[in-house]
Regions:
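N-terminal zymogen propeptides
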Residues: 28-69
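Sec-dependent signal peptide cleavage junction
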Residues: 19-30
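Aromatic- and Gly/Pro-enriched, solvent-exposed loop/edge beta-strand patches characteristic
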Residues: 205, 359-440
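Predominantly the structural core of cysteine protease catalytic domains
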Residues: 28, 62-71, 81, 88-93, ...
Length: 539
């Protein structure tokens, strides 16, 4: 008797779930040419950086000497060549160390400096088309690979599109007419979640916090003023001239409290130094590393970065340029970003907020199915939770439950500062006054709202138009097949975009499914295979 084919109709059903867990001899190569970025003045951040609630409180039992290199958390030294993108090399190295340290990548991970450099200055838009009109224009004759970057712009790029793998975007592309599409820009494997500015200057006052961040995450991002004649013959650097400018970015990967002050050409007053990973190749210093005195006055903009795997994540955002110099102060009022849902089968799982404040308490509210995008609260209050700004930088806030988003509707992320506290939030804004780089924002499709009395006012209008750096992070749930025809006795495997769930067949007399998603035809007819993870059911 001829076997009849079975057809499984798979349709996606999503319900709201609990929390989603997102998951010393100096050897200088005579041929090396140290390349730095254009000098920039440090801008002191007046906001106090440390706080008893910060994620990385320094502990008093830190050892006198530590090296992430010796512990296997640091990738190999690279050479930026003639390009001025030291910042990209430092950022990628810090990310690689974080991912290795936290078991999210192997020790041979290699992230693309070329991808980060190119898309910092060549925005192509985003998968939701919310930033398609935003442009960054490099006016410097050095071009995008040589113009350098403000360290505060680095965290913005890392949280906007993230980091790709070197294999897809090798560094050779930078000097060979690199180009790309929207799909390329967001073809990234890792995304920054939190960025914590430990200190903008005066690093001697923050030694314990810097050490703790290195110990926790493998390394930190930092900048200083490079001046060649201050490198000593013991892999050392100390500039006794008090500099308040920067021109080079590096990663700090360790420390030694007893590094002798006599190892420096110009002696500081005390022993102690940071172990620095550079980007001038292994021919510089001690296989690419050197020691910098704790007393180096130009050392600043020290950041600790956290990352997550960019696994089926979506980013709703309006801030398409990396303009680092705009922020908005909010007190006794609410702000909101309203987004239109343009994809199927998405759940809102987290919110990302850029802030120059720290320790500010606020209410976070999510409204869905808005009747009017110009009124962020004219919808269903899906969640409300009390939060506190943890970082000067980007703050990744996990929602207490996932929010199902319906294609074609609008949802709002509303932030309400508490107790009269001032929230100084990062913002994007058109600025064509800079010498090397100009930022142009397209506000035409944006709903960035400020509450004024009982009314909500669009912020993307008028002479002071701006865009709040508030992002909605979603997770898309999919199966590798939406239907299948299966003969009795045959098997095929279904694969879900989320692991850790359970499979179920609505009619086991027609088909069974095992714990690995293998579906086997048993009898004639139709049935539905359902997969459930963290309370989310799709089939």
């Amino acid at each position: 008797m001829k076997r009849r084919l079975l057809k499984f109709i798979l349709a996606l059903f999503v319900s709201i779930s609990p929390i989603l867990t997102i998951t010393n001899v100096l050897a200088i190569d005579e041929n090396y040419e140290p390349t730095v970025m254009p000098s920039r003045e440090y801008e002191h951040i007046d906001t106090p950086i440390t706080n008893s609630n910060t994620r990385s409180r320094a502990r008093s039992n830190l050892q006198a000497k530590y090296s992430s290199v010796d512990n296997g958390f640091v990738t190999g030294v690279k050479n930026q060549g003639s390009n001025g993108n030291c910042w990209a090399y430092a950022a990628c190295s810090v990310a690689e160390s974080y991912l290795i340290k936290h078991g999210m990548a192997s020790k041979n991970i290699d992230l693309s400096e070329a991808h980060l450099t190119y898309y910092m200055y060549n925005n192509t838009g985003d998968p939701y088309s919310n930033t398609d009109g935003d442009r960054t224009i490099v006016t410097s004759p050095k071009g995008y690979a040589g113009v350098g970057a403000d360290p505060r712009a680095v965290e913005l790029a890392l949280s906007t599109f993230g980091l790709a793998e070197e294999s897809g975007y090798p560094e050779s592309l930078l000097n060979n007419g690199m180009s790309g599409t929207k799909a390329d820009q967001y073809n990234t494997k890792y995304l920054l979640t939190n960025s914590k500015l430990i200190c903008s200057d005066n690093t001697q006052n923050y030694k314990d916090q810097i050490k703790q961040a290195i110990f926790d995450n493998g390394s930190v991002f930092a900048t200083y003023y490079d001046q060649g004649n201050y490198y000593g013959n013991k892999n050392s650097y100390y500039n006794p001239d008090k500099k308040n400018i920067l021109n080079h970015a590096i990663s700090i990967v360790g420390w030694d409290d007893n590094f002798d002050k006599t190892n420096f050409n110009s002696q500081p007053t005390e022993n102690g130094a940071w172990l620095i990973k550079n980007s001038w190749g292994p021919g510089f210093g001690d296989s690419g590393y050197f020691w910098m005195s704790y007393e180096e006055s130009s050392l600043g903009y020290v950041y600790s970065f956290d990352f997550t795997k960019n696994d089926h994540l979506g980013i709703y955002q309006y801030d398409g340029t990396q303009n680092p110099l705009c922020s908005a102060s909010i007190t006794y009022t609410n702000i909101a970003d309203v987004y239109k849902v343009t994809k199927d089968k998405e759940n809102l799982t987290a919110v990302s907020i850029g802030s120059k404040s720290i320790g500010v308490a606020y209410k976070l509210k999510i409204y869905t199915n808005l009747q009017d995008p110009n009124n962020p609260i004219a919808g269903t209050l899906a969640i409300e939770q009390e939060e506190t700004i943890q970082n000067v930088g980007m703050n990744y806030v996990q929602l207490n439950k996932e929010i199902s988003l319906q294609n074609g509707t609008y949802y709002a992320i509303v932030i309400e500062p508490r107790y009269g506290q001032q929230l100084n939030i990062f913002a994007d804004q058109t600025n064509t006054n800079f010498l090397d780089v100009q930022y142009q924002c397209d506000y035409s499709n944006e709903y960035c709202m400020l509450k004024n009395g009982n009314n909500w006012i669009k912020q993307g209008e008028g002479n002071n138009a701006l865009t709040y750096r508030i992002k909605g992070i979603t997770n898309k749930y999919t199966l590798n097949k939406t239907s299948m025809n299966l003969a009795v006795g045959n098997s095929e495997q279904l694969i879900a975009s989320r692991s850790g769930g359970s499979w179920r067949s609505t009619n086991t007399s027609i088909a069974t499914v095992d714990t690995n998603g293998n579906v086997k035809g048993v009898g004639h007819g139709k049935t539905t295979i359902t997969y459930t993870v963290n309370g989310i059911e799709f089939s």
